[in-house]
Amino acid sequence: MEKMINIGNCATPIMCLLIVCSILSQTRPVGGESAFFQRSGENIVVNGGFELEKDGIPVGWSAPHGIASLDPANAHSGKFGLKYARTDRNDYRLVTQQIPCIPGKIYEASVWVKGENIKDGDQWDQGAGFCIEWSDENGKWLGGVYPPCIVGTFDWQKISTIVRIPKEARRVSIVLYLRRRNTGTAWFDDVEVVQVAPPLASIQMISPAYRGLLLTPTKGKKISAKISINREEHGLVGKPLEIISELTDAKGNSLSKGVKVLQGDEEETILQLALPELKPNEYQYVCHIRIGKKELGKLEERINVVRQVEAKVYVDERQRLIVDGKPFFPIGLYLGPTEEEHLARISEAGFNTILCYGYGVGRDPEAYMERAKKYGLKVIYSVKDFYEGTRYFPKVGKSGLELARDYVMKLRDHPALLAWYINDELPITFIPRLTEMYELIKSLDPNHPQFQVLYQIPDLELYYNCTDIMGVDPYPIPSRPIDMVSDWTSSAIKAMNNAKPVWVVPQIFDWSVYRGGEPREPTFQEKKNMFYQALIHGAKGLIAYSYFDLFKTTGRKEAPKELFEKRWKEVCEIVAEINKLVPALLEGEDVPKLQGVLEKGKVHVRGITYRNKLYILLANTSSDSLHLTLPLPDRGWKSASRLDGREEKVKNGQLVLQLQPLEATTCVLSK
């Protein structure tokens, strides 16, 4: 993603909120609709306005001499602002203050900043702003939140973010700075960090998960919903709560009802409501939250009972994408160029999906869609830049929602359209705007789902109610363990309650393209391993990042033709193998006894039965050669071979094989 370089420079994703706060119009969070969070404390920053000083140094702050100073000529309010001037791009000293945050609590942090000629640095790591970081009791860095910074010359602007301090954090600091290798002058003032309270409760629909669509017949089915309660912030610790769930028709008649009591320490629960036979119609699912006879609030969702889903593209109960009535497994690429030469190459390689950043204002989207159609490619169309204030927002005199409306109305009926891409790693502060976008597009185009990609793994649950498909983009090579892919995939599936599909963005690029330094791209074995990990842990789609980086080398220089060809050959080989697995992935049944991690976390395995065959997907994430003896679910399986035809042993109800370091493979067993 464009903004992914912040991840690499910051080394860890943002750590934020505790629970999803549903902000859909029909599922407002209980406890206040006017704001996502409410301030519940005072500013914990000492001398955030820089009015107190001693010997020219602002009280409470660590301000490096020669860079930071009080400035009476530039204050947002009061007498002083803090001036931060850097002329040496290698002088990376910071203004800091340790702040008394409570682990597990949620805070709103904000800073007013003014800038003059702030420039240079990596194009992905520029500007003036602030961050919040935390460490353990020994001072070891654990993570942080890094709001977007501002570049150039500009008057006072406010930067803010919401952050949940992880429970393991012991020291928390706020940092004022210019990003690494930037020069220029910034002024800071009115720094605030204030504890905020989330709404009382929120809801996530688990079944039906896709837009409230429930297929007939309904008798014997259940509505399932996850309810989360913020007890501590609302003074409810130790108090039993009663949750009454009910399905009503348009006239308010009760059709099914259930009651569940949450004891004083329970903060979330899964409610299930048995259904009678329902006629196709719209219904209301309501959860009342009570303490004694007093109702604290209610949560509501619409349920639409239908005989069949009419949408051209939708997500079914197995989390598969259904396109024109048939299951579809997206194998795609992020790309920039869309000339026929590139689309022909991508299609010939076996990809079926593309996601292009480059089509927006000033382009010809219809021609792009027609080219994709010509080569049999489905398009995830990006509207991810249509948020005012973001780096690539088109300044054409229209709001983001107006731009989105224009593009959706223009393209919603095109046969090449697969889904809408509404978010590329935007932080949780954008959730209200993401929800507006999601609701608008859903109302204009009920025929296509919406997709977003995030690296903020602890926060994924927060986005549950403003997406149909969740994506994650783990890029471990070279600085992180390769099983980051399986960790992120599993975490995303858990965050989506195993109810909404997760697509994974495998890494096929070299980080040095963005960061500079020594080149170190993933090897063929590493790339294949990452694809396999995603599939083994339940990904329902793969959109690799990125085609355009295959043409680049360190520092975004053009790669030699032979380097591109080598990279492309490796990617094509992986995709050819994945395509052989697609029928089993779409139509097969998982084997519970063949799911998980073996050999002390080194080998990841998934078993799928399909058409009297047993497919066993394996990924060795270690640098060791491993001799594997895998017990089979029954002794009926007699022979085994890999997808390339190599035979393996089946002995005494066990599959016996050797896995090379980082090897990923599939064994197909027959009876």
What residue ranges belong to the model's regions?
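Extracellular and organelle-lumenal recognition/adhesion modules and their flexible linkers in secreted
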Residues: Q26-I270
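C-terminal beta-strand-rich structural cap/linker in extracellular carbohydrate-active enzymes
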Residues: K651-K671
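N-terminal carbohydrate-binding accessory modules
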Residues: K294-S347, F451
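Active-site clefts of carbohydrate-active enzymes
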Residues: I493-Q525, K552-T554
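Active-site groove signature of glycoside hydrolases
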Residues: L403-R433, M437, L454-L460, Y464-P476
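Aromatic/acidic polysaccharide-binding cleft in carbohydrate-active enzymes
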Residues: E518-E573
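Carbohydrate-binding surface patches
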Residues: L598-R635, L662
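Aromatic-lined substrate-binding rim segments of carbohydrate-active enzymes
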Residues: E340-G400, D406-Y407, F430-P449, I482
